[in-house]
Amino acid sequence: MIELPEAINLAKQMRETVRGKTVSAVYPPSSPHKFCWFNHEPEEYQALLAGHTVTGAAGFGIFSELEFDGGVRLCFNDGVNPRFIRKEEVRPKKYQLLLEFTDGSAIAFTVAMYGSISCHSGDYDNEYYRKSIESISPLTEEFDEGYFKELLASVKPAMSVKAFLATEQRMPGLGNGCLQDILFQAGIHPKRKVSSLSDCEKNVLWAQVKTVLQTMTEQ
């Protein structure tokens, strides 16, 4: 599943490979997947995206997002895997969405387990998307000790540290993949109750959230 470091790196890879390319065609699923969700009928993505040029890409929370001219965006999450395909490469037989560009290259999106691929113009009213894009990222200066302690104070004292970090999208993009490293580096058992943490342990935990996510993003 996509976590924050991967979301950011996927966006970086897409900027490097498809920025400046114009969509010539959009193909709906060649192999329908009952756990791949769209916010429009897949056949409508052709009209929504064809003719638009990729201007950038962003990663936030549990989402990566392609940005096009005209304010059009294509976001995906969870088990959705984008694959860049060069002009000379054979297109995969199975995909959930395929964008073809005017230079003959393409991006194929496939889904492992489950995920969503949504096209919108900044008005995507999805709870997980809104939390991902609007929450303060652990990789920013705004995510300081004070903000982290506010999050800690907002949960029930009996909640485990593991549940605090990885549930309810309190820190979108922080999931099980990052969690174990954070707790190991902080020296805190995942079943410890939030109420049992000393101020020193809270500071160490905050620092490791930022450090581990930054390190994973840069790898």
What are these regions (language model features)?
Residues I2, E6, T140, E201:
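Catalytic cores of large soluble enzymes that bind and process phosphate-bearing ligands
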Residues T22-E44, A58, L151-Q219:
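Basic, nucleic-acid-binding surfaces and adjacent catalytic neighborhoods in DNA/RNA-processing proteins
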Residues M1-C119, E127:
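Gly/Gly-Pro- and Ser/Thr-rich, intrinsically disordered tail segments characteristic of DNA damage-repair
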Residues L74-Q185:
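Phosphate/anion-contacting hairpin/loop surfaces
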